[in-house]
Amino acid sequence: LSDISKSEAINTMAQGLKHTLKMLYQNEKIDGVIGMGGLQNTEICTAAMRELPLGFPKVMVSTVASGRRYFASVVGKSDIVTIPSIVDFNGINRVSSVILSSAVAAICAMAKEKQEICWAGPCKVIASTMMGVTNDTVVLASQLMKDKGFEVLSFHSTGAGGATLEGM
């Protein structure tokens, strides 16, 4: 890897992790995935996590999970649970040990209670978007659709919701 740029190395590692996680998931060898790191490790881990289905347990402990960073590039249209590390990763200390223990407890609980989303079913599905001033109308329209036998999935139009709806 010494002959390639840092961004190429990060992309290569992300592709390798995507392949590995996908294979482990398909062969039912993992019940969840947890990652930790700064910006580069966050990019590598979450690129692979985003390839796993909605509902599959995913936790990322990251130095960039809070603050002013725009987080769409990390989470995308996925359901990755992000936990701010608060301190940088420079060994285990009184702060990092508590944060990491909490993250491990979270992924273990998620894996134990894992329920993947079943997209097959007897009723038809309608998707809608909601945001602020449209809420009352969407709630009313949703009830009318439910009364006619539809399941209504309402997505917030910004953030992961809107992007997920567009990707369906």
Annotate each PLM feature.
Residues 2-5, 69-133:
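Cap/lid and interdomain-hinge subdomains that line or gate substrate/regulatory clefts
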Residues 39-47, 68-69, 134-139, 162-163:
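Short glycine/serine/threonine-rich phosphate/pyrophosphate-binding segments
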Residues 121-163, 167:
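Glycine-rich phosphate/diphosphate-binding loop of Rossmann-like nucleotide-binding domains
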Residues 12, 16-20, 102-106, 164:
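Well-ordered alpha-helical segments embedded in enzymatic catalytic cores
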Residues 32-35, 44-74, 82-84, 151-157:
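Short, acidic/small-residue loops that bind anionic groups at enzyme active sites
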Residues 1-27:
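Phosphate/nucleotide-donor binding subsite
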Residues 27-41, 132:
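Short acidic, glycine-rich surface-loop motifs adjacent to enzyme active sites
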